């Protein structure tokens, strides 16, 4: 392993080091606020969080039309910033990157391809949302200190002028958030809670925080995420249930007119992540024993002893249209569902049962935290699911617009998949996108 990435050949490693050195020298005399741009028409950013004598942490620019790295040094930030998860503004003007290694929010201008500021956070954050106009960011920090209150809060950061924290809204143990389409509400989800907190951003006063009481809606079961309806009058809340210390996994309606919990559908297969496509909701999770076996609809032959499930829900009727137990997929804690071309659905998890292949020349199963489901086949008697031969946590998935290509991060390595075959087409051992260090997330910033 080389900095968390499979070893390269000596010649290729030397070539990579020379390339990195050349790129670094090209950018060494300019500041992080350089206005020089690559001029690429379709760009993708990859966050890389390792700094050493041969590589530097930052955002790497990829030419997504040619699948090659841009001839530019990684976009870095001051203070040893080590970027992880990224968040794209609705208008695509900014990309925010969070470093949980040093509790910092980095702000990057997509037009100038430069860092325009960093803001220290009071703790790690796994969820950030931006206002529709990209003027404000909200970071969920479960450990944020609050005088006279339990820790946890939504940290409000201005992104205009000099970036900085303007307020903190106390929400104990807040972990995840989702914003309504019109920006009028933020739903906040806290650890070990059976409630959803509704936060109206317009009532947050700079320097003071929330100036009206927050609305807390009870009646859920360890809620962790939600999806707003098109008119923002209701939301579908994902109840994590037993995977998060609760009782029953389900999808439940939140009435935002009366602020009450509504109807729900139990999901035996588990719910930790979801994706809406038209009137269909796909959810993934890992059920509790004895229901987490690797036998059932769509099951593949595997040495893994525990598996997760993919369930399909019709939203208008709030009923499961897949087999009630769900389709068999990889286990772990599922965090990513991403639709791709040709009806392919990429499913990513962390802390799954990795099956490592035997040493060569022997052959055997290899399996990690990625599954691909052909949604066109899920309503047939022969559902098609694929477990690509790779290992590690899946931390980023990005389908490329108008292409049958998906960029993906698995085990800290950059991968490229072809949706016509569901196979890896280029990996770090063979592609022109060598990433020294550890890749974390991937985001397309042009559409």
Regions found by a protein language model. Name each.
Residues 19-20, 300:
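Residue-level signal for mature regions of secreted extracellular proteins and peptides
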Residues 22-25:
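C-terminal motif of bacterial Sec signal peptides marking the signal peptidase cleavage site
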Residues 11-13, 20, 67-68, 113:
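N-terminal leader/presequence-like segments
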Residues 1-15:
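Bacterial N-terminal signal peptides that target proteins for export
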Residues 27-447:
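Predominantly soluble domains enriched in secretory-pathway, periplasmic, or organellar proteins
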């Amino acid at each position: 392993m080389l900095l968390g990435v499979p070893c390269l050949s000596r010649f290729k490693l030397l070539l990579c080091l020379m390339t990195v050195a050349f790129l670094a020298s090209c950018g060494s005399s300019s500041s992080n606020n350089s206005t020089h741009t690559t001029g690429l028409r379709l760009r993708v950013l990859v966050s890389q969080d390792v700094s050493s004598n041969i590589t530097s942490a930052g955002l790497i620019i990829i030419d997504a039309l040619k699948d090659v790295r841009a001839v530019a040094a990684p976009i870095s930030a001051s203070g040893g910033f080590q970027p992880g998860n990224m968040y794209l503004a609705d208008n695509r003007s900014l990309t925010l990157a969070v470093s949980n290694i040093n509790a910092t929010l980095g702000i990057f201008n997509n037009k100038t391809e430069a860092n325009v500021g960093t803001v220290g956070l009071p703790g790690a954050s796994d969820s950030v949302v931006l206002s529709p106009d990209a003027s404000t960011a909200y970071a969920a920090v479960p450990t944020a200190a609050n005088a006279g209150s339990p820790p946890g809060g939504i940290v409000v950061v201005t992104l205009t002028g000099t970036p900085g924290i303007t307020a903190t809204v106390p929400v104990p143990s807040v972990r995840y958030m989702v914003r309504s389409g019109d920006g009028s509400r933020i739903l906040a989800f806290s650890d070990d809670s059976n409630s959803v907190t509704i936060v109206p951003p317009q009532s947050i006063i700079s320097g003071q925080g929330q100036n009206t009481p927050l609305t807390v809606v009870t009646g859920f079961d360890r809620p962790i995420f939600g999806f707003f309806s098109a008119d923002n009058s209701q939301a579908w809340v994902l109840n994590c249930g037993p995977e998060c210390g609760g009782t029953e996994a389900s999808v439940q309606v939140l009435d935002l007119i009366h602020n009450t919990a509504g109807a729900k559908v139990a999901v035996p297969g588990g719910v930790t992540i979801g994706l809406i496509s038209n009137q269909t909701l796909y959810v993934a999770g890992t059920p509790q024993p004895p229901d987490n076996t690797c036998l059932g609809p769509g099951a593949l032959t595997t040495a893994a002893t525990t598996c997760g499930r993919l369930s399909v829900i019709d939203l208008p009727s709030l009923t499961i249209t897949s087999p009630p137990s769900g389709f068999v997929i990889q286990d772990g804690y599922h965090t990513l569902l991403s639709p791709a071309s040709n009806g392919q659905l990429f499913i990513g998890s962390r802390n799954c049962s990795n099956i490592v292949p035997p040493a060569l020349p022997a052959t055997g199963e290899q399996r990690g935290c990625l599954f691909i489901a052909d949604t066109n086949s899920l309503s047939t008697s022969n559902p098609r699911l694929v477990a690509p031969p790779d290992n590690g946590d899946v931390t980023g998935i990005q389908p490329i617009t108008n292409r049958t290509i998906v960029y993906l991060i698995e085990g800290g390595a950059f991968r490229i998949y072809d949706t016509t075959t569901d196979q890896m087409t280029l990996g770090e051992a063979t592609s022109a996108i060598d990433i020294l260090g550890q890749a974390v997330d991937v985001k397309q910033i042009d559409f």
